[in-house]
């Protein structure tokens, strides 16, 4: 076997196993949680045109600025439409690619560690085979650990996978840049040779692409500084540290721009609002606890959840054993590794990578209501995984040094490794099943966090989608007992009441939601719908207009406003709103049908026929559209076509008296014409 190809075979092996284990995710559906706003109802990604690219790059959407992620979702939609299989397939392929890159990057870094270490350094136990062992173990851990399921099985977390891809490629290109330089201390190199090295520029480009995918990549400049310190050993003095920092200036500038845009984007949806209510001291304690908890979940991946609620303020104090132990652990471990770094730097370097890559999402700048999230560990986990890989290689080296029992030790090591792969694969499959759909996901959330409002709200939404209204109401009430000022829960409870035709209660809930969150466009639209059902049309129109002032691209509000205008006999205004709705959502059969009905009233029969046909192209079994099309044909005296449509209506709705009556009229006219 060609020795140069072995790393690629190993990487492909780890990647293929990862891909195979994740295949059951292809059966998963979208989930309402973010998949809705990222893909399902995101009309912008439905067209790959100049308007889409302008949208992707020019503003903040869903509290984020990550244009490359939007482009990725748009490409998926262009190929797969709203078939979740294709979107999940892309995620799985990206994760498998990242696993492939992890193996190759680990081999490259370990080889450079060995090349640049002193003869008596710890890296001397790493020969070619042991480097492959360390990299292979790291890659399998990265690919199969259930902590990463959230990033892969959740379509909306495409940003993790894309960011990870370009993050890894940037480090790999930077390592090539280091290899291209003469193996000398940094202070002896000219700046020009550093900044105009092709690999350096490639690394910078990949970093920018990572930022355009997810701003969590902002930590990369510090990671590169850390690599310069160890294992590249380019930083040997304060001057070389300064020069290394100067070399990273383009990265730092890009990171600062991305960070600024991210904070601005998060503020548009109030995601950073929690900062004002959680004291910095409490956030620091929760962050310290998260550092420890994440390591625990790497070591023993049980109790994983898609939502870890933020602790209540009175629970977060230094006298609490949980937080005191966490602070002692983080500070103590850091101190021990700093002392140990005089002889052995690899542990501090790996710990530093873990801390640095977690800091942007650890909660010091609090975003959202979660204390931690599995998805945040997608890149930081590499540090601990690589250490585990090195331990496996060290055990193999010790086995090689034994005069007797070497085969036994190696056999036990292989057996443990196989058992680990099987166990991780099983745990990953279990987590993939949790992400099957809204119901399985929210049920798991409630089971693991019964005292948090968001899981109950999500379960209520899942019940609402299944039309299990009493159970939905129960869950929304449970959420509001835990968080009475939760506007989203009030809005969803209003939706459940509206479906039960309890309109007064629905109106009350929508009004409560709007008192808590005045810029809640969905609540305005839902309140308008409730008013419309109560025949309070002026109030309904007012609410739909309020929703559209907040969200001009809100297709459903345009549609609802069109219906309200139609009921008020304001036909031209109704036409305007239906057309506006269809520009945003051209595949809405209801809007085509209702627009056609308005055209019928205006005696614009050709336009009416066009709209009814458009509705039926989208929804062929829509009996109302068939009936309306038949009526339009009847008015045009196109009797055979009208007969065909009314017969189709009766096949779909055999007891439709109006269709039967119109069919008889058609037959009578045909007799008269003969």
Language-model features: where?
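Conserved alpha-helical positions within TPR/SEL1-like repeat arrays
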Residues: 454-465, 488-499, 511, 522-533, ...
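Terminal, low-structured helical/coil segments at or just beyond the last alpha-helical repeat
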Residues: 643, 647, 655-674
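Polytopic membrane enzymes that build or remodel cell-surface glycoconjugates and lipids
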Residues: 1-495, 522, 526, 560, ...
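Short coil loop/turn residues that delineate tetratricopeptide repeat
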Residues: 444, 448-451, 485, 519, ...
């Amino acid at each position: 076997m060609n020795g140069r190809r072995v790393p690629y075979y190993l990487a492909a092996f780890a990647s293929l196993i990862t891909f195979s284990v994740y295949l059951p995710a292809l059966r998963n559906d979208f989930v309402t949680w973010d998949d809705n706003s990222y893909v399902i109802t995101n009309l912008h990604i439905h067209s790959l045109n100049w308007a889409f690219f302008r949208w992707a790059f020019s503003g903040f959407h869903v509290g984020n600025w990550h244009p490359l992620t939007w482009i990725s979702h748009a490409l998926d939609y262009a190929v797969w439409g709203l078939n979740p299989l294709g979107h999940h397939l892309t995620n799985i392929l990206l994760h498998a690619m990242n696993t492939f890159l992890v193996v190759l990057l680990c081999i490259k870094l370990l080889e450079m560690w060995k090349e640049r270490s002193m003869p008596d350094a710890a890296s001397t136990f790493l020969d070619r085979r042991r480097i492959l062992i360390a990299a292979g173990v790291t890659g399998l851990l990265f690919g199969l650990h259930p902590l990463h399921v959230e990033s892969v099985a959740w379509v909306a977390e495409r940003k993790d996978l894309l960011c990870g891809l370009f993050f890894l490629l940037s480090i790999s290109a930077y390592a090539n840049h280091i290899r291209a330089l003469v193996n000398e201390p940094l202070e002896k190199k000219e700046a020009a040779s550093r900044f105009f090295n092709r690999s350096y520029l490639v690394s910078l480009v990949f970093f920018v692409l990572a930022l355009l995918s997810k701003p969590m990549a902002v930590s990369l400049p510090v990671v590169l500084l850390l690599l310069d310190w160890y294992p590249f050993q380019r930083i040997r003095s304060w001057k070389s540290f300064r020069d290394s920092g100067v070399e990273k200036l383009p990265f730092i500038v890009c990171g600062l721009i991305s960070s600024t845009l991210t904070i601005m984007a998060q503020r548009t949806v109030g995601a950073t609002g929690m900062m004002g209510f959680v004291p910095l001291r409490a956030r620091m304690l929760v962050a310290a606890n998260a550092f420890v908890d994440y390591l625990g979940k790497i070591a023993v991946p049980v109790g994983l959840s898609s939502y870890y609620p933020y602790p209540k303020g009175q629970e977060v104090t230094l006298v609490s054993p949980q937080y005191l132990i966490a602070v002692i652990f983080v500070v103590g471990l850091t101190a021990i590794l700093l002392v140990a770094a005089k002889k052995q730097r690899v542990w501090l370097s790996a710990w530093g990578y873990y801390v640095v890559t977690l800091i942007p999402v650890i909660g010091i700048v609090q975003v959202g209501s979660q204390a931690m999230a599995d998805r945040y560990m997608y890149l930081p986990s590499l540090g601990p995984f690589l250490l585990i890989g090195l331990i496996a290689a060290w055990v193999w080296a010790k086995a090689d040094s034994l005069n007797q029992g070497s085969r036994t030790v190696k056999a036990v090591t292989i057996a443990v490794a196989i058992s680990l792969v099987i166990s991780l694969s099983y745990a990953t499959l279990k987590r993939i099943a949790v992400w099957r759909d809204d119901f399985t996901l929210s049920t798991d959330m409630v089971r693991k966090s019964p005292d948090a409002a968001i899981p109950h709200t999500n379960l209520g939404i899942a019940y609402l989608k299944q039309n299990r209204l009493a159970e939905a109401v129960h869950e929304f009430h449970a959420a509001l007992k835990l968080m009475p000022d939760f506007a989203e829960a009030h809005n969803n409870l209003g939706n459940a009441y509206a479906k039960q035709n309890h309109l007064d209660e629905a109106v009350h809930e929508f009004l409560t939601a709007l008192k808590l969150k005045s810029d809640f466009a969905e609540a305005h639209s839902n309140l308008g719908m409730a008013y419309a059902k109560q025949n309070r049309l002026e109030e309904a129109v007012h609410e739909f207009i309020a929703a559209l002032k907040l969200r001009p691209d809100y297709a459903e509000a345009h549609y609802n406003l069109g219906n309200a205008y139609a009921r008020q006999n304001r036909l031209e205004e109704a036409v305007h709103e239906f057309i506006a709705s269809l520009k945003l959502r051209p595949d809405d059969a209801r809007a085509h049908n209702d627009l056609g009905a308005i055209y019928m009233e205006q005696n614009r029969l050709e336009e009416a026929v066009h709209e009814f046909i458009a509705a039926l192209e989208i929804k062929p079994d829509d009996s109302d559209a068939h009936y309306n099309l038949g009526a339009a044909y009847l008015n045009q005296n196109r009797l055979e076509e009208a007969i065909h449509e009314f017969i189709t209506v009766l096949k779909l709705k055999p007891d439709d008296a109006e269709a039967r009556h119109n069919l008889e009229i058609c037959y009578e006219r045909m007799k008269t014409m003969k």
